[in-house]
Amino acid sequence: MARVKTGPMSRKRHKKILKLARGYRNAHSKLFRTAHQSVMKALSYAYAHRKKKKGDFRKIWITRINAAARMNGISYSVMMNGLKKAGVAVNRKMLADLAVNDLPAFAKLVDVAKAKGNA
């Protein structure tokens, strides 16, 4: 069996990493070792922040719902409890959209939550 050298594959692998590191500053886009470290760190940040993004959006939705609910004289927690008791299946994303774009519809949901929250 013939001996296989890894030169062409190493070159290909190095080029792939250096291509991913384009736009990085100084040695991080030119030297393989530092570029590889930077790319691996960037990919791990990207993975983690894709997960974190879901929570960030949830926080934004809750803030918007709370602000609109307080304009209607009810707190976020009381509203969500009232909607749950009333059996209203509207998620936070939809509620936040209503709070921003359709205040009359949101006000009706607040009334439903108030009615069930007090009962």
Swiss-Prot record:
Biological processes, Gene Ontology terms: ribosomal large subunit assembly; translation
Example GO molecular function: structural constituent of ribosome
Keyword entries, A-Z: Ribonucleoprotein, Ribosomal protein, RNA-binding, rRNA-binding
Gene3D superfamilies linked: 6.10.160.10, Ribosomal protein L20
A cellular component term, taken from the record's GO annotations: ribosome
Family: Belongs to the bacterial ribosomal protein bL20 family.
Physiological role: Binds directly to 23S ribosomal RNA and is necessary for the in vitro assembly process of the 50S ribosomal subunit. It is not involved in the protein synthesizing functions of that subunit.
Descriptive protein name: Large ribosomal subunit protein bL20
Gene label: rplT
